[in-house]
């Protein structure tokens, strides 16, 4: 029992841990294990020098995603944080999204965006919706807004197609996202709703707003009814603010109200419902007799709107005829509409023939002269254009009287006349207008061909301006081309009949069996076949639907015929009937599908439809079934309504109703409860742009908010709707409208034209509308009086905060009547007279943030918490300013500026941040830092920021002293300085003496001799010493006397004037000779390409290529050198040559023989080599282990062969390696020992990308795999206008990765001296330690001189004025002939001295 209890307890603990893990999901932050290092062997620390603002250990996978790639367009010594040559105030920066773990302060960048994020809202613990002016998200083309799922990193697009504009604002309401802006969607404007669960976007029920409208803000007022069910609590109203004056469904704004006044003249537009359907003649065959026009013109007149005409030959009768397509033959038309041309010519008498019965049709029509029904057959009259329009004009004058007949409808605007001529069903009507007359067919005759014969004409020829046929049945063909409208321009109309093949392949029966004539239909043999037919049922009423099935005898398919399932679906997707139909009928047949009521549908998204799908075959075992689809016919039995009516402002129809409009100007209240059972048919009945307003049209209320909207001018614009917290009584709530306002009403006046402050009294749950107190006072002045404060400019944005709100923008706020009534948050709430750009309003008091005015329109705000500190971030036009709201002060350190526009906390442990740059780097320091015991610290070097500086080189001298160099400045030091290793935090010391550096001079290499007496500096430009000596190439500094030596080497240069470089120096201790390598070819006047030896003892340059018994020549650029024997140096570089032989990667120089050679095994490396490290102390034969890096490679040498070890490095155009070292592990490891011992690990520094990890500046290699170690950051800043005062935000920045140029350690493997191989005691002599320590600590040359006065004579008695005692010249040297070049060189030296 106890065991079972223990097992159960362990299970519960596991479940609890699992739940906690889910709650604090750190799956995004996978830790990276770092090896433990022994810092004692590296001088107790690892120095990192370069170009950066901050550093972090690479603690988790993708740690460095918060930094961007470096800007390769900027020079390595032109810092990205110093790109300040732009004065633009609209500089655009890319934005990013960051996931931050609040608990561990980890940050992960998971998205790059090519624009600004303006809104960011949490949808769930795993998803957010973001909106802004971006079109690309992680290089994926998108339309804003989008939904981003964090765990899967998937983007859900709300809009998949172009919306011809942009979404300016979004509002999240549970499962719905309201979208507002200036866009077009689904033929509606400026508003839409996205359902998060269904993943579908829809038009709003009110069909958005009018063309050229714009929605800038959306908010919600809850109904506040505590007694309603929980699911009803979220109703209330949605408020839309922007610039608009109508709704997309504008009839919602017209109320049909009862009126006692029945004598006012009715100016309504009336329209009879035309339920009859236009028969498509588009694919008919057109012929004519005695036609003057072409057959093309004969076909074109079936689309009268194209303004084409068909003319008979002059002074001659003629015939125009159309033969229907085979599948349409036998149709029963109900009327023809004949269009009359303008001008003197036209048809006076005509007759209509029908085929195949070849008979003259009996016709009935409305005689325009009497407006009575008339009949004709062989001699039917048409009026000419002028006479017809006289009658139409007369109708306009007598419209009121004519419309008293309920079966007659006269349009009061254009005088068109219609009446029903089937009083029982009222499904057919007849009429005329200014350019046509209609003629109904008395007999119900099936026709294959219809012809119009011209008997008499007006003028000198008969002309047809158009011809249309109608029927009172709705026929949908399976062959969708037969559903095409007569006019191509109507092809996209939602009211067209159409057929959609859902699955399967359908063909014309005539294409399968050409012998079949006089009929055509679709055939398929696919067993998954399905087709849907959409009849144009535009009006609600009773319909009878039948389906026609062709007989199998026509095509001989009886044995193969199929069984089909036919389903009738209503416009609300309800299944109305289902039929199983056997298709093996020999002759044509029809089946009843449905009889009953159908709702009229106006769009393809809510249409009645008939679905036909394959079920099986009548005969079992048939392998090639034969499913046929011909047509479906919906016959109109009766309609619910028979007329439409539309009216303008305050007019009356004949039944005593008045149409009262609701006026909108930039503000609209959308009641969710009112629209919960919305049906557009309860708004109006619409046909041919003529509208009748329903008495039930009460969806949009004339609420006090809509009333306020109507009383604003039509130039008003609302930029923001802001709702304050509810007041103590629980009902009243503040409503702030920000924008540009004027009032057109005498009933409402405004105290300013920027902000309207309202109070929501309550929400009326009966009328489903918001009750507000309307403003009623006018004060117009240049300044804006808002809540007791005077603003000299408009507020751009309001931000709701708990118990208060913020106003931000390009303004200055002063106290009422200039008083000091404003409190300064940055100065213990002391009274001040003004606030600039940002102001907080709380408890009837305005507060300032203590900043000076900045000429910038701040329009973005976000607040977030970092390291338990709340920050406010204000931004606009690329400028950011960060306020520490816990300590009430501005953040002035640029490295701590939060360039964020949005923040959203998604759970207790994580938040999403959006902006141009964000950093939670672990350690802030400019260009220098060191690691000791696994933590960052920094040297006593205060490099001046915002300059193009970089520390590029370093040299560890001994336990007391290190030297750094580059191109940098501190308060007292320039380009080179001395660091105390015993106290690294102590202030850096400068070199003593007068020194003037050239503008572009850079310390490229450093070396201190084995006796720690001389500091050799390799420089690429001029240096003036002690106001008289100009040096380029090598500068020598006396560390003992703390002064520049009085002897300095002749300058290094290029004979063609090109810049030089001094990349490496090594010292041959025995001969006291310094070997210098780089890119140059002259030392003074001495030819000395690539390599030159400086004889320290004799203070002269020697060309090593001419110093041997046999002259040798070398070429290329030397980049690195190291001793491998006490008298031999291994040299590498770019494009090295020896005696004209190219392709050499490594050279060997022997100081004893003054000769050059190569070792074949080393030169088998395929890549270029810039630097290398010898990883074995005993490597006399160069068969030890090595590692080398080049521009695009890192390779290891096992003593015999080279092998690439950089498979995990991704090479890009910015990839750069700068330095490498061997570090010591805290404990021996089981690492691969191919390239170094198991107690060591290799590190390389620069800037590069590691596979699976991302950007790094420093990585470790354990012999098998790479481990990211350190990455840095650097703010890229650009000027964006002037700013002053505390917290000045005149610069916008983006976080990029920095550079590590040099690793400073006590390096046992640098081998820059032949004595380095001896592993001698490197400690300074007692006198030197005391002297240098005091010099570094105190910087006092006077004290240094006093301390050295005694040991100087004892220890350095052979030195005078910095010179070594010259060695005796041997007799054999005196016997050699003097080289003229050397003689000239000696003359140069004496001249310089």
From Swiss-Prot:
SUPFAM superfamilies: Galactose oxidase, central domain. Residues 1351-1393 are cytoplasmic. Disruption phenotype: Leads to randomly positioned branch sites and reduced bipolar positioning of secondary hyphae. Pfam families: Rax2, Rax2_2, Rax2_3. Residues 22-1329 are extracellular. GO terms for biological process: cellular bud site selection; hyphal growth. The keyword Cell division applies. It is a single-pass type I membrane protein. One of its GO terms (cellular component) is plasma membrane of growing cell tip. The chain crosses the membrane at residues 1330-1350. Belongs to the RAX2 family. This is Polarized growth protein RAX2. It comes from Candida albicans (strain SC5314 / ATCC MYA-2876) (Yeast). The lineage of its organism: Eukaryota, Fungi, Dikarya, Ascomycota, Saccharomycotina.
